[in-house]
Amino acid sequence: MESNVPKRKEPLKSLRIKVISMGNAEVGKSCIIKRYCEKRFVSKYLATIGIDYGVTKVQVRDREIKVNIFDMAGHPFFFEVRNEFYKDTQGVILVYDVGQKDSFDALDSWLAEMKQELGPHGNMENIVFVVCANKIDCSKHRCIDESEGRLWAESRGFLYFETSAQTGEGINEMFQTFYMSIVDLCENGGKRPTANSSASYTKEQADTIRRIRTSKDSWEMLGVRPGASREEVNKAYRKLAVLLHPDKCVAPGSEDAFKAVVNARTALLKNIK
């Protein structure tokens, strides 16, 4: 006679993962980790010397995760120390200070360093990246707005969070989403799940918005040579308008970029006979 007692569900196997932090010195990498793991903020700045290592356990969907965290020093002096720790990583916390443009501009350099150290057989597509726009509590000194940071992250398929290690804002949500994404990666055969947001706009749109942000004048913004004809200006404008119109483009910063293009066209046509 068969028993009607339901079979006991086997507990999911625990996971052991490796996470590293990356970013310039003084952007708050260690403070973010301490805020999450120790529920405290260290106001006195103490630079990380080489590598700080810690272990924490978390629960993700009834699964125990043992997280090995390697907090890497951001100063170039420690390159020879940290370059040994890039391999066999499942997750990367990439941090910049919203009040330091240099730290934001350096994100590409950090990715390049990691790619170089992983070598030709390393695959960064199988690693979960989360970008932390840190120190949002210092709003008076902010120079990188959310749309610019989010665009950089999402166009690469990375997670993006606005954080403050001082107040704790965004920290728990960031780590929870980060760990869930790593579990998804492990359960997906080591392949990073596709971020939904990154599929909603094209690389061309993202690159165009970045170019418009950094343009020095209206000519450069429209992508035409100084002294271009009225017809050339209008042609360039129409192409950009189709690409960036807020009704068609959902990329972060698209509305501001579209307005900038409209203003650039107006300014140029005033001076063209």
Swiss-Prot record:
Residues 217-273 form the J domain. CDD domains: DnaJ (cd06257), RJL (cd04119). SUPFAM superfamilies: Chaperone J-domain, P-loop containing nucleoside triphosphate hydrolases. Its main location: nucleus. GO terms for molecular function: GTP binding; GTPase activity. Residues 1-18 are annotated as: Required for interaction with MAPK1. The keyword Phosphoprotein does not apply. It is found in: Nucleus. GTP binds at residues 23-30, 71-75, 134-137. Pfam families: DnaJ, Ras. GO terms for cellular component: nucleus. InterPro entries: DnaJ_domain, J_dom_sf, P-loop_NTPase, Small_GTP-bd, Small_GTPase. Belongs to the small GTPase superfamily. Rab family. GTPase which can activate the MEK/ERK pathway and induce cell transformation when overexpressed. May act as a nuclear scaffold for MAPK1, probably by association with MAPK1 nuclear export signal leading to enhanced ERK1/ERK2 signaling. Interacts directly with MAPK1 (wild-type and kinase-deficient forms). Interacts directly (in GTP-bound form) with MAP2K1 (wild-type and kinase-deficient forms). This is DnaJ homolog subfamily C member 27. It comes from Rattus norvegicus. The lineage of its organism: Eukaryota, Metazoa, Chordata, Craniata, Vertebrata.
